[in-house]
Amino acid sequence: GRTTTAELDSLDVILFKRSNMNFVRTSHYPPTERFLEYCDRYGIYVESETAVCFVDTYRQKNYAPGKTQDSAEFTPRYLSQCREMVKSFRSHPSILFWSIGNESVYGTNFQQCWDWVKATDKTRPVIFSYPGSVGEKKPVYDILSMHYQDVNGNLNQWNRSTHGFQGEGIPALFDEWAHPACYTYATLQEDPNIREFWGHSIERMWSGLFDAPGGLGGAIWGYVDETFMLPEPKVGTAFWKEFARTAKPEDYQGKCVGYGEWGIVDVWRREKPEFWATKKAYSPVRLMTTEVASFLSGQRLLLPLYNRFDHTDLDEIKIRYTYKGVEKELPAPSIAPHQKGLLVIPAEAWQEGELLSICFY
């Protein structure tokens, strides 16, 4: 097995904040107690996920044969993971809801996990993926979990759908989306601008979801690169090639294994270009225009502003603007969370083609 250090737990949560992320899904490994303590301290919302995934899906060939989700023999294994998670972490205020399975087909063992969680913790919702596999059976989720919708928020997955980031009569969470380009090495070499385009797509998706009724949020897959070193070549490392959507499967042999370099930071926690694209897209303060077409020299500028904080009025932050090399500070207007208003820039000798730089901090 492998684990993190206290230093990495702290650094990871701090990097979440620096990138303007406020939500993390602990897929698919149990987090450390330290990590959740930092989430409590810094105000990160957490979806805590049991270590059960890929049951009866296309990855089944890599696991024991049979449909374990309906097998009484496997019930203790399902419940042990679920019970351990809830009993260990239920006192953390950062945890908003429990996930009882990832990208799996419904069965009675997932039903028993739902029943146990609902009897044990009546304060939190439960989520399950794939929800469409439940069909008309007894529900095992309060929130619709959808993975990898298009940029407009549309997806049909196992007969459950979203349109414009909205579920059908149920809140929708896209708790796996916006996978960075990492598998198509040849294409990335030909056109590195694909990574720049990824930044435009995440900004478009987040802006669309933020205003969608019932659209709760999204979780980028993933935060950190999934690559790690083994002390020596081990029997079975070829298993990783089963998941490698790459033109060079030989890269998955030997000491270096993992699913791929899919993070917005690398394994040393160095920020990649995707980190800065995320920071920009998830900015909690959004100027609704980047160009002022109509203005009068010597008059104030009125700029539309969107407060995308969940709990913070904009008058709690500071504003600094620079025009013609002169930097000035400005008190922020009072705009309630999730509301729009106006930013008033005092009169200047405005001229066409000049740059006005505004910093919110």
What are these regions (language model features)?
Residues 7, 76, 269-272:
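Alpha-helix N-cap/helix-start motif at coil-to-helix transitions, marked by capping-box chemistry
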Residues 207-361:
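Carbohydrate-binding surfaces of carbohydrate-active enzymes
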Residues 1, 50, 328-331:
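Short hydrophobic alpha-helix segments
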